Amino acid sequence: MSKTSIGLDKVQSAELADKLNELLATYQVFYTNVRGYHWNIKGVNFFALHAKFEEIYTNLVARVDEVAERILTLGYTPNNAYSQYLKISRIKEDIAVSEAQECLSGTLQGLKTLLDQQREILAFANNANDEGTASQMSDYIKEQEKLVWMFQAACQTCHN
């Protein structure tokens, strides 16, 4: 069995890097969507939502960098072209969204998509004995589960 420079199985690491590149794409498209919500939100809840979306997209920028660096740590190259991201992202571009309910719903659905994808990667990383990736995914999942709860609550009482 051939090993990577950090002692992981090369075949499993290559597959994990592919999964992480798909996650990177999902994060990048979600980031762009949330940035658009921040710019274009309208309505009575503008100030609160404008600030919340900025908080979220700022966090997403950090996650993008961390996922890309994990791919590099595994010995592979992160995708860096937006055209690649659009092909493999599990989230599609959200175009011309400005109503609060749509922005909240888009954010909630994006978070749920990330959770599903990260849980798949967590399971694969655990099977590959990749504690670094597993720990990273576990941290993201914990953080995003709380955000899902908050956005579900916000979607129930949203005013357009």
Curated annotation (Swiss-Prot):
> Which Gene Ontology molecular-function terms are recorded?
ferric iron binding; oxidoreductase activity, acting on metal ions
Output the SUPFAM superfamilies linked to this UniProt entry.
Ferritin-like (SSF47240)
Q: Which PANTHER family does its entry note? A: GENERAL STRESS PROTEIN 20U (PTHR42932:SF1)
Recorded source organism is Haemophilus influenzae (strain ATCC 51907 / DSM 11121 / KW20 / Rd)
Lineage, top-rank taxon, reads Bacteria
Task: Provide an example Pfam family for this protein.
Answer: Ferritin
Stated name of the protein: Uncharacterized protein HI_1349
Family of this protein: Belongs to the Dps family.
